[in-house]
Amino acid sequence: MLKLVILCFALFYNTVSSTRFLFGVEVKCDFDEVFQLTVSHWEDDGNTFWDRDEDITGRMTMFARKKIFFYQDGHHGFEFGKLEPYGWFLHNCTKNGNFREYRHGLSSTSGSNGLEYIEYTMSEFLKIVRANKKSDRKLDKTYLWESYLHQFEKGKTSFIPVEAFNRNLTVNFNECVKEGVIFETVVHDYDKNCDSIQVRWFARIEKVCGYRVLAQFIGADTKFWLNILSDDMFGLANAAMSDPNMDKIVYAPPLAINEEYQNDMVNYVNNCIDGEIVGQTSLSPKFDEGKALLSKHRFKVGQRLELLNYSNSTEIRVARIQEICGRRMNVSITKKDFPESLPDADDDRQVFSSGSQYWIDEGSFFIFPVGFAAVNGYQLNAKKEYIEHTNKIAQAIKNGENPRYDSDDVTFDQLAKDPIDPMIWRKVKVGQKFELIDPLAQQFNNLHVASILKFCKTEGYLIVGMDGPDALEDSFPIHINNTFMFPVGYAEKYNLELVPPDEFKGTFRWDEYLEKESAETLPLDLFKPMPSQERLDKFKVGLRLEAADMCENQFICPATVKSVHGRLINVNFDGWDEEFDELYDVDSHDILPIGWCEAHSYVLQPPKKYNY
């Protein structure tokens, strides 16, 4: 292997080392005000092509202040050395607003043309090699976390760690990916000169931010950000297992190796392997096996299930799975299953159309197995054939028999919930009160007074509604193990707004209301147990995440924790006013670590004030 490494490195070094890496910086701002900064990365092979966008190999846009400076070390000629760092600016940070262009070296960090500079260095940000390689032009507009990741390197921002969230992948990688772990990764220095051979080297994880890791090549100073779910990250010895003859995969270090080893590759490789890899914690083959399982889903496109009508929650309709993205599914009502003319898709987001997007997690309270409505006597809007089919399923379940499903039915087993302790379940009574985040609302920033209205026949399911004259009309079925129900007094204890029943007059007090209604509270042991304090402490104000908008559930947005209220976090969508903030339980599947969208080829919406 050693000979192969040296030969490969020598071959590529002679052809690639003359490339210089340059940064062009475009600045647009008002004088002395916050500006938008776009950094474009060219590979300069000796030609000058500042105006050709097709030659840009990477671009990053951020908001900053004008006292900033970018530079990049590189190689010049056929000898290792440092290219003189410089900055190339086009800006209008002048009193008269005229554009000014200049080139400035880093011999000093003081001014040129009347401006002062601070030095700003950053690691390489690798474009994601997506686990889902499906080409999609809409992904060109997805938001990336580049600027915040580089802020993290400077200690200026932080992210909620993956282990704090409820399960959001079909495979759990929390125990695999940790600081200090060594893995194999693709070295892209050689991409242009190697069409059929993949070049890899070893790297160590320095920091973990959601599904992004900051890593450093073994034996080099180069650091880079990589998504752990990309096709560029492998367990140690993956190359030997996947390509035993090493015909298509070779090991070679990055071009920017430490200077002391540039002329002594034998010692370089030996020191890397013996001194920094042998005996260290490495990414195991289970990591690669887990990634392979990500493409295997519990459900399949075309399956049918039952979907709660979000605009009429007393009704269930038949829906089909249109797309699957990890745990999330795009489901819609189709003409194939609807007994009448389909409602207008502009008025009903659950109705199928060419651009319909109704994305929910596979654990969403909105979906039920085929036969749920029939088993529980819930209003079902479906074709006659489907109603007859599900009545047979309900009868079989009642008789203790195995139902006969169609091949495309989502079954009760596929959407099974955790069993409920019978002793605890006996404590539940119709009329018991609790506090509720209305999952059918247009705003998710308060709790409501609510009651249990009736029991479903399916174990663990209840019909609940918010107290008031429209309680039955606005009621809906929900499993007791959910992220929307909270015990009486929760809002007051954690400083949240509690909305009293409609038409309630005066100041609402729980003790007075319970006495007036001759009602009791839902016992505490019926609610989800409070997470450990250790886990809750991982949700801190200012930490960043990705969050699905519960009003427009096709949108996943960059977001920030604004406040913490027990097991509820108040999330602000970056760039949006606080009136659009939403409350999420820490167990919600609608909050995600950063990098989730990137790894699943799902568009992460840019912040509202972010100019793309």
UniProtKB/Swiss-Prot annotation:
Keywords recorded for this protein, A-Z: Chromosome, Nucleus, Repeat
SMART domains, per database record: MBT
Record-linked InterPro entries: Mbt (IPR004092), PcG_chromatin_remod_factors (IPR050548)
Effect of inactivating the gene: Multivulva phenotype in combination with loss of function of class A synMuv genes lin-8, lin-38, lin-56 and lin15A and with the class B synMuv gene hpl-2. Reduction of brood size and defects in the development of germ cells. Loss of function results in suppression of mat-3(ku233) mutant vulval phenotype.
A single BP term in Gene Ontology: vulval development
An example molecular function term from Gene Ontology annotations: chromatin binding
Keyword field contains Nucleus: yes
Cellular component annotations (GO), alphabetically ordered: chromatin; nucleus
Localization per record: Nucleus; Chromosome
Residue spans of the MBT repeats: 143-249, 263-380, 381-501, 508-607
UniProt-listed SUPFAM superfamilies: Tudor/PWWP/MBT (SSF63748)
Keyword Electron transport in annotation: no
Annotated effect of mutating residue 253 to S: In allele lin-61(n3624); does not affect binding to histone H3 trimethylated at 'Lys-9'; multivulva phenotype in combination with lin56(n2728)
Result after altering residue 580 to A: Abolishes binding to histone H3 trimethylated at 'Lys-9'; in isoform a
Free-text comment on this protein's domains from its UniProt entry: The MBT repeats specifically recognize and bind histone H3 di- and tri-methylated at 'Lys-9' (H3K9me2/3).
Function: Synthetic multivulva class B (synMuvB) protein required to repress the induction of vulval development by Ras signaling. Unlike other synMuv proteins it does not associate with the multiprotein DRM complex and the NuRD-like complex. Interaction with methylated histone H3 is essential for vulva development. It has a role in maintaining genome stability.
Subunit structure: Interacts preferentially with histone H3 that is dimethylated or trimethylated at 'Lys-9'.
Protein name: Protein lin-61
Species assigned in the record: Caenorhabditis elegans
